[in-house]
Amino acid sequence: MSDINTARLPFFQPPEFRPPCVGDDIEMVLTRGE
C-alpha cells in the first residue's frame, strides 16, 4: 500500500503537465490497488 502512495507523489500535478500514458497507468495502478 505504501508503494502505491509513494508512486502517486510525483503525479500530484495538473493532468495537462503529465503524458496521457502516465495518467492512464497511474489510474490503473490505483484501481488495482484499491
From Swiss-Prot:
There is a cross-link at F11-P20 (Cyclopeptide (Phe-Pro)). One of its GO terms (molecular function) is toxin activity. Keywords: Toxin. Probable toxin that belongs to the MSDIN-like toxin family responsible for a large number of food poisoning cases and deaths. Residues 1-10, 21-34 form a propeptide. Belongs to the MSDIN fungal toxin family. This is MSDIN-like toxin proprotein 3. NCBIfam families: amanitin. The gene is MSD3. Processed by the macrocyclase-peptidase enzyme POPB to yield a toxic cyclic decapeptide. POPB first removes 10 residues from the N-terminus. Conformational trapping of the remaining peptide forces the enzyme to release this intermediate rather than proceed to macrocyclization. The enzyme rebinds the remaining peptide in a different conformation and catalyzes macrocyclization of the N-terminal 10 residues. It comes from the Eukaryota.
